[in-house]
Amino acid sequence: MACAPGALGHRALWAVAWGLLLLVPVLAGAQRGRKKVVHVLEGESGSVVVQTAPGQVVSHRGGTIVLPCRYHYEAAAHGHDGVRLKWTKVVDPLAFADVFVALGPQHRAFGPYRGRAELQNDGPGDASLVLRNVTLQDYGRYECEVTNELEDDVGMVKLDLEGVVFPYHPRGGRYKMTFVEAQRACAEQDGILASAEQLHAAWRDGLDWCNAGWLRDGSVQYPVSHAREPCGGTGSTGAGGGTNGGVRNYGYRHNAEERYDAFCFTSNLPGRVFFLKPLRPVALAGAVRACAARGATVAKVGQLFAAWKLQLLDRCTAGWLADGSARYPIVNPRTRCGGPRPGVRSLGFPDASRRLFGVYCYRAPGAPDPAPGGWGWGWAGGGGWAGGSRDPAAWTPLRV
């Protein structure tokens, strides 16, 4: 039976309407798949919706980054001046640190964020936070909370940093550090304890290390790219799946009694690392004086790793570092420089009184230039560094 044109039109409209109603949840799910969106619905008016998209942003030490956060609600029911914006950092699963709070014209940053954090203020509904001079300690997850009277909503943003993970143990030997001592050791070498995510990313990038170390969450793990018996065996399954390698995990350990090495993380250098080549080998004390005479300090382990990874420092000569170890960075592997893989080679911790090596120095930005008038460094003897204009070829600063 043929339908009347009018009836067909009404049925077509109802079909389209039902199709749209069914399509809305699908579109909403797709939208949530693209960005972090948290919804709290409080009726037809006054609903607060917070969006933090993208859910992860990447910066580097010394950089400036925007932690995105936008909110929307019925402005007719509430004015924007009554909205409180609060940023916090997740320091533990159930612990938070205040970062920034704003209520109308009143703004306040807290602790280490003072002078570095401010709202972006890109129009109504923008709660994004601008963070300047990013530090290693800024790495982590942040919550953006928007509160209006009894209504609130929260979005999450993760701040990641470009950098490098490096294994570390002090002169005392392997497996000597508690969790707190590992934190301190990383800080002394211009780093922080790496996160499990950072260690996993380093493993995917080829990090292979057969000694277990503390991570920032209190777990103990180690990355194995090439499975072998001394490193968990050839049949162990790590975080990467399969039996050919992975991140071996000892789980969460007693942080005051058990002792391991550390996996540290560091990021971009604000200054530069360079190598000073002596006329004759020097002891560690002489290396310290040589760097000081060049307006620099002896480089830390993390600074050398950052110069190798991020500034491509390549030098096939061992040099003293601040912790008393001797190392050298290789970007382009060659046989005479430690084997077929790039990395920072370590010669361990030689006797500091022995005259064996040159030195890797670190010069911070804005450090005063050495006194003009020759190549002298203000000290004589004690290592035989070239002085004056007598032998300018006897030292080699490598700028990166």
Swiss-Prot record:
Q: Which residues form the Link domain?
A: 164-266, 271-363
Molecular-function annotations in GO: hyaluronic acid binding; structural constituent of synapse-associated extracellular matrix
Any one Pfam family match given in the protein's UniProt record, by short name? Xlink
In this protein, which residues make up the domain named Ig-like C2-type?
47-155
What tissues express this gene product? Expressed predominantly in brain where it is found mainly throughout the midbrain and hindbrain in a perineuronal net pattern.
SUPFAM superfamilies registered for this protein in UniProt: C-type lectin-like (SSF56436), Immunoglobulin (SSF48726)
- Disulfide topology: C69-C144, C186-C264, C210-C231, C291-C361, C316-C337
Name of the molecule in the record: Hyaluronan and proteoglycan link protein 4
Q: State the encoding gene.
A: Hapln4
